[in-house]
Amino acid sequence: MKFFVDSANIEEIRELQNLSLVDGVTTNPSLILKSGRNILDVIKEICTLIEGPVSAEVAATEFEIIMKEAAILAKIADNICIKLPLTLEGLKACKALAAQGLKTNLTLCFSANQALLAAKAGATFVSPFIGRLDDCGINGSELLHEIRTIYDNYGFETQILAASIRTVNHVKEAALSGADVASVPPTILKALVKHPLTDKGLQTFLDDWKKTGQNIA
């Protein structure tokens, strides 16, 4: 499973990239707002750091305007992935952009039916929001399983990009569900390495090593 860091913060992305933990980046209007920067500037800078797909989201809901914004975003770099709302207009734009050879990410997916439509429209990625479903008392990981089954049944090539990840357990659930990608906030991505027994065991080894009085270097 690939990791796309969910951030528009250049320093956060650079730190994780230096650890070889980033296969791509996802952004959205909320993250752009949080960055305090112009969307075109920040997306361009991210694309200079990351070789994998960088999702940049349109701010339009009507087909013609979506296509205009997508054309502007697509010119930023070859690894741009146009992020679209999972609506009828978004599906129409997805089909048109896919015909142009552009990568697309249909976002705000909350049902298997929506994911089926995304695949039929030729989306590169579909983004089920598992955290927001959990907030509503619906099992988000179950949706991932449903989408995986449907895609495997019909040989769809659209990749499942698990989004709205709130916990390290969400990452595990995404992997167990067969998601192709997890869109993970930097704090969660770094937390994956943590386990209290690892810390405890390491401290024991360090204490014992100190008692040997030896040095390796």
From Swiss-Prot:
UniProt keyword annotations, A-Z: Cytoplasm, Pentose shunt, Schiff base, Transferase
Active site, UniProt feature: 83
InterPro entries: Aldolase_TIM (IPR013785), TAL/FSA (IPR001585), Transaldolase_3B (IPR022999), Transaldolase_3B/F6P_aldolase (IPR004731), Transaldolase_AS (IPR018225), TSA/FSA_arc/bac (IPR033919)
Pathway: Carbohydrate degradation; pentose phosphate pathway; D-glyceraldehyde 3-phosphate and beta-D-fructose 6-phosphate from D-ribose 5-phosphate and D-xylulose 5-phosphate (non-oxidative stage): step 2/3
Biological processes per GO annotation: carbohydrate metabolic process; pentose-phosphate shunt
Superkingdom in the source lineage: Bacteria
SUPFAM superfamilies: Aldolase (SSF51569)
Function field: Transaldolase is important for the balance of metabolites in the pentose-phosphate pathway.
UniProt-listed HAMAP family: Transaldolase_3b
Protein name: Probable transaldolase
Name of the gene this protein is made from: tal
